[in-house]
């Protein structure tokens, strides 16, 4: 079994701009500056890359599973331009306030539950990779991302893009290992310890 370090990433507000509603099409998907570069750098440094995202707009009838998958496919197309991609993508379609007969069985996968992370770890194990949690990270813009990562035994980074819930984390006494301005700084400045100059 090969040891693997993994970068688990939230999507909206971390990789792409939070537009104030569910992203339902490629046209609404706008990369945050240098997010794709950050993912490529992490891949070059030996990280497996896994997407973990809540998409409750599905249960609410605002977006469809196909919409979410199309947007994720588009993201992978953008990453392919940098010769990188996600190893796996997971999303939770459920929401406790919007019961849906098709999606309610996934409610316990919703972040901050670590179920999607644990599923990814199990799937990678089936492929011959044993995830080293002590060398793996969860990066997101919300309190639930930090909590999810911590519950899965990962190091956590909160980014100030998107919702920027730094003060909310403090209120709930849930502290990430690091706070970064954006995904690029999180990867290069903290995980890899490289200079973060944008020149």
UniProtKB/Swiss-Prot annotation:
This is D-glycero-D-manno-heptose-1,7-bisphosphate 7-phosphatase. It is found in: Cytoplasm. It comes from the Bacteria. Its main location: cytoplasm. Substrate binds at residues 10-12, 18-22, 53-56, 110-111, 142. Signal peptide: none annotated. The record marks 53, 111 as: Stabilizes the phosphoryl group. One of its GO terms (molecular function) is magnesium ion binding. One of its GO terms (biological process) is carbohydrate metabolic process. The active site is at 10 (nucleophile), 12 (proton donor). Belongs to the GmhB family. It comes from Chlorobaculum tepidum (strain ATCC 49652 / DSM 12025 / NBRC 103806 / TLS) (Chlorobium tepidum). The gene is gmhB. Keywords: Carbohydrate metabolism, Cytoplasm, Hydrolase, Magnesium, Metal-binding, Zinc. One of its GO terms (cellular component) is cytoplasm.
């Amino acid at each position: 079994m090969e040891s693997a370090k993994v970068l688990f990433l939230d999507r909206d507000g971390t990789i792409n701009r939070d537009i104030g509603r569910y992203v339902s099409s490629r046209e609404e998907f706008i990369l945050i500056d240098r997010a794709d570069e950050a993912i490529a750098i992490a891949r070059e440094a030996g990280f497996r890359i896994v997407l973990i995202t809540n998409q409750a707009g599905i249960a609410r009838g605002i977006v469809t599973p196909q919409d979410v998958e199309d947007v994720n496919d588009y993201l992978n197309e953008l990453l392919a331009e940098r010769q990188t991609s996600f190893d796996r993508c997971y999303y939770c379609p459920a929401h406790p306030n919007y019961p849906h007969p098709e999606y309610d069985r996934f409610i316990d996968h919703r972040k901050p539950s670590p179920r999607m992370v644990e599923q990814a770890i199990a799937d990678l194990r089936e492929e011959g990779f044993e995830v080293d949690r002590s060398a793996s990270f969860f990066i997101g813009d919300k309190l639930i991302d930090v909590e999810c990562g911590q519950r899965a035994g990962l190091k956590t980074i909160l980014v100030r893009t998107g919702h920027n819930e730094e003060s909310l984390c403090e209120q709930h006494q849930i502290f990430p290992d690091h706070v970064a301005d954006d995904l690029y700084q999180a990867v290069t400045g903290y995980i890899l310890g490289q200079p973060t100059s944008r020149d």
